[in-house]
Amino acid sequence: MAMGLRWGLPADLEKVNEFLHKTEPITAFLGYRLVELSEGRACAVFDALSNAQRVGGILHGGAIMTALDETMGFAALTLNDGDDQVTLELKVNFLEPGVKPPFKVCGQVVRRGGRVVVVEGEVRDADGRVIAKALGTWYYLRRRVEG
């Protein structure tokens, strides 16, 4: 996941969300929208329950992982200098069923090295219960993305 453009902080979240929905349509499908973007941190909300539920009316784990990947990737991106980046690893623990939207997902950089950054994330439901925790690693490719 990469923005493909150089934007500064604070970012115009409306423009970032518009760009994201155009270039990564799954975010629009999930009702995903960034609400916070600061150095080493990103938060978003999404209400995917009607589009991405499994039997029993529970939010699908793949939707949770997608929201974590996007948000944690944005947290890593805030420390990037405009180069492309990729997810190397993403480990998710599902702690509670996701049944109460809207869901809030946040990612926070834990450590940044030269080309590798470690990010932690979590998803909460409308009642503030943590439904998933994650730890991931992103790799900066050192190549510019046109966009």
Swiss-Prot record:
Is Hydrolase there in the keyword field? yes
Query: What keywords sit in the KW lines?
Result: Hydrolase
The Swiss-Prot or TrEMBL record annotates one GO molecular function as: fatty acyl-CoA hydrolase activity
The EC number(s) this enzyme carries: 3.1.2.-
Q: Which SUPFAM superfamilies match?
A: Thioesterase/thiol ester dehydrase-isomerase
Q: Does the keyword Cytoplasm apply?
A: no
Which InterPro entries does the record cross-reference, listed alphabetically? ACOT13 (IPR039298), HotDog_dom_sf (IPR029069), PAAI_dom (IPR003736), Thioestr_dom (IPR006683)
Pfam families, from UniProt?
4HBT
Organism domain of life? Archaea
Read off the CDD domains from this record: PaaI_thioesterase
Give the family from UniProt.
Belongs to the thioesterase PaaI family.
The protein's name: Putative esterase PAE1329
Q: Which organism is it from?
A: Pyrobaculum aerophilum (strain ATCC 51768 / DSM 7523 / JCM 9630 / CIP 104966 / NBRC 100827 / IM2)
